[in-house]
Regions:
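Outer-membrane beta-barrel channel domains
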Residues: 1-170
């Protein structure tokens, strides 16, 4: 999945996570299929997919209270076992499928090795687009994201609709 330049250091004292842009080419190619249509107010489009979590920092394993991991151990990225992505179109439909599987995260403290199960990711997107003869545009899409981990599974699903007149109005 390639080595990429590192991110700038950001000090975030707020309640919300700082999101960094994706730089890995595998995840950048075809990513527009997984992005929901933009908002009418001109804001950023919504997405359920944050590819930066894939192969990111692993979950710490359960350990006795007296075991402390170093900052270096806590910040190690998890190795990816593999990932598969396909995007394409058939008629008025565009689709995208993405699956990735992480290896188990291994931590070491005081000469003892601890491990935590890796996470599996799956994302599916189906988008129907209709570009009218008069220049108008309609789109209806479905997006589903799933993560599987021994401690917790998560699911998020969404439907989006986009309509733009030939004059460029919503």
């Amino acid at each position: 999945f390639g080595a990429v330049e590192s991110d700038d250091v950001v000090v975030n004292l707020g309640a919300f996570e700082t999101f960094f842009p994706e730089k890995r080419l595998f995840f950048l190619e075809g990513i527009e299929v997984f992005t929901a249509t933009p908002r009418a107010e001109g804001g950023d489009p919504t997405t359920l997919l944050n590819t930066r979590r894939i192969g990111g920092i692993g979950r710490e394993p359960d350990t006795p209270d007296d075991v402390e991991f170093s900052d270096l151990e806590r910040q190690k990225p998890v190795e990816l076992i593999g990932a598969l992505k396909t995007v394409g179109s058939i008629g008025g439909f565009r689709y995208g499928l993405l699956g990735a599987s992480e290896d188990d995260a291994v931590y070491e403290a005081e000469g003892v090795r601890y491990s935590q199960f890796g996470t599996d990711y799956g994302v599916a997107r189906l988008l129907y687009e209709n570009k009218g003869k008069t220049g108008d545009y309609q789109a209806l899409g479905f997006l589903s994201a799933v993560t599987r981990h021994a401690e917790q599974d998560t699911q998020a699903h969404g439907v989006d609709y986009h309509y733009l007149t030939a004059q460029g109005e919503w």
